[in-house]
């Protein structure tokens, strides 16, 4: 199939595709023109609600927009910027896990619950305890355990939640912590952890987080762990590597292996790594998608009716307005050794 724009009537982005009850549902961000100035922290992305679309034929069938399923005004703790989200099912309930900024300008993850995948979703009154940053991906493993992968740099604030250690003779002797006092979260002790100092490309790249969810899918059941992407020699990718993690975590499983895929941010690629369990480490494999039109790239990978698909977005319909993005889909294929064939955007 040729790449297909799924819903050209509106600007949707950051697609999280899931199969529920034999139908494919996509939970996107909802772009609009807020008039906010462009900045490196994503202030021009002022999304304020979520919709869900569904289809029974990905390649040619009708796409239904089920309307708004959650608005920022319904979320007591959130002020603005309803960024990426994902939905997972457990025991007949559907859990929307989303990212938004609170009234201190700090991103957290929240949960909203529905009886149907079409919503509407009712939000919890408080964000997930100890949550931070953006871009949650909710992954349900074969044993029923649910894991959430999350994190994004720059405007996604992931860099706030690492003690920045001295890693260079020119760096200060005492660690510098960029965390705001209003944003304090407990991600567990890490006294010897070295992380990325901006401008130090030989430091280990900042990883995303993964955490197993509680039985009610409303809280973390443990301290989040780092999702480490390593090279073929077993070494973590460096901050200066254009293939290192930046944002947009996604997890899927193929032939018993765990595929962690992500956006590289300022190098604008989708890349992936493979591991043997949900926590990793994950060994870097390659590029899934080269840069598209627009600054961000964000995706999901899902099997539906025997065919694998890559869902993503670009800014071609809006003439390269980076905060007005459009959903896109095309087929995805594996090689015999389990590696993913690079997808060519058209």
Where does each model-flagged region fall?
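Carbohydrate-active catalytic/glycan-binding domains of CAZyme proteins
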Residues: 1-346
């Amino acid at each position: 199939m040729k790449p297909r724009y799924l819903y050209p009537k509106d600007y949707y982005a950051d697609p999280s595709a899931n199969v529920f009850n034999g139908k494919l549902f996509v939970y996107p961000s909802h772009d609009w023109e807020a008039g906010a100035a462009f900045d490196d922290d994503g202030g021009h992305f002022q999304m304020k609600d979520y919709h869900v679309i569904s289809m029974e034929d990905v390649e040619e069938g009708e796409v239904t927009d089920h309307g708004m399923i959650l608005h920022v005004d319904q979320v007591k703790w959130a002020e603005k910027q309803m960024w990426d989200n994902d939905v997972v099912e457990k025991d007949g309930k559907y859990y929307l896990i989303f990212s938004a900024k609170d009234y201190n300008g700090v991103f957290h993850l929240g949960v909203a619950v529905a009886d149907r995948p079409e919503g509407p979703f009712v939000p919890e009154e408080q964000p997930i305890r100890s949550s931070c940053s953006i871009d949650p991906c909710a992954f349900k493993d074969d044993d029923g355990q649910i894991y959430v992968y999350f994190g994004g740099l720059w405007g996604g604030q992931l860099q706030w939640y690492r003690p920045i250690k001295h890693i260079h003779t020119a760096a200060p002797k005492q660690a510098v912590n960029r965390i705001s006092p209003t944003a304090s979260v407990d991600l567990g002790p890490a006294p010897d952890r070295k992380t990325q100092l901006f401008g130090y490309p030989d430091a280990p790249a900042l990883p995303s987080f993964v955490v197993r969810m509680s039985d009610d899918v409303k809280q973390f059941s443990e301290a989040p762990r780092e999702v480490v992407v390593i090279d073929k020699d077993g070494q973590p990718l460096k901050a200066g590597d254009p293939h290192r993690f930046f944002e947009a975590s996604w997890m899927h499983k193929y032939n018993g292996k765990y595929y962690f895929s992500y956006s590289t941010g300022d190098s604008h690629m989708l890349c992936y790594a493979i591991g043997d369990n949900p926590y990793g480490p994950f060994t870097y494999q390659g590029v899934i998608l080269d840069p598209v039109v627009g600054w961000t790239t964000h995706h999901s990978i899902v099997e539906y009716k025997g065919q694998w698909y890559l869902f993503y977005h670009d800014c071609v319909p809006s003439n390269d307005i980076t905060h007005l993005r459009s959903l896109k889909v095309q087929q995805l294929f594996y090689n015999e050794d389990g590696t993913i064939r690079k997808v060519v955007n058209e």
